[in-house]
Amino acid sequence: MEFFVISLLNGLSYGLLLFLLSSGLTLIFSMMGVLNFAHASFYMLGAYVAYSIARWIGFWPGLVIAPLVVGVLGALFERICLRRVHRYGNVPELLITFGLAYLVLELVQLVWGRIAVEFKPPAMLLGPAFTLLHSPADGLSLVLGAAPAGLCDAAAGAARVLCSPFPATRAFMMFVAVLMLAVLWLLLTRTRIGLVIQSALTHPQMVEALGHDVPRVLMLVFGVGCALAGLAGVIGGSTFVTEPAMAAALGPVVFVVVVVGGMGSLAGAFLASLLIGVIQTFAVAVDASLLGLVEALGLAPGPQLAGNSLLQLKLSQVAPILPYLFLVLMLIFRPKGLLGTREG
């Protein structure tokens, strides 16, 4: 039972990190119609900027300052570069953001090097947020923080206690992602600037006639989307690894989340992030194969069948391709995504 609970929480935390990153891309696409190919590069940039700040004044100032720096850089890119090609359609926008992704990668390698940097979370996030205890006598219980010393090292037998800690970094990741979801929802539905942003999407001429600067609103949207990616980078970089390959590792999965959830749908991105995070985490955690399934059904595979390399593939080995399989199935059976309204 504790394996299921911890795996589920790990999947939810990974899914919420995906949402924190994909929410910025979804916001940019829904408001501007721009599919930012360099979005994961802002994620990487947030991690590296926070790493540099944390070395001088600590992690918590870096958590606040790095997303702001990345957001300003994103807004400047929209103002100086993206706005100039916007009138020519989607292909020039894709090409210029594609070029930006490689430019950011090369700059990161020039400034911080080609190997991973040691970006650690603060001391208060290094231990477990809580520990699940499972004993034959008391069943499943929960202890905040680490388990009492010596409890998990009890002798084998009836007194043995299984301890499954859940890292505080992942709990913090979940908290920040849910907080950002609430802030985005309140901003877009309960504030004046949110109403202006949504109106600028559907009736830009009317909004401009009312005295609002539509290009500045769109620049703000792009900057906020990049800042969300930077915030995800601070948390993801300190929790996992901060290296030049982190954008390439997570970027394709983020595009899968946006398409599966529905282009431009924040609710769809949230649902798709959780689904992909949980499915991929359980696939990595479960040690199973088609051959094992055949044997579990009581069938006796012959020597030729037992030696088949395809049947011997573990579920954990195919876990990295599951999001893309999900994407293909979604495009075949529901092209507009889970909660999307656009077919293409």
Which residues make up each language-model segment?
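Transmembrane helix-bundle core of multi-pass membrane transporters
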Residues: 84-85, 93-190, 286-320, 336, ...
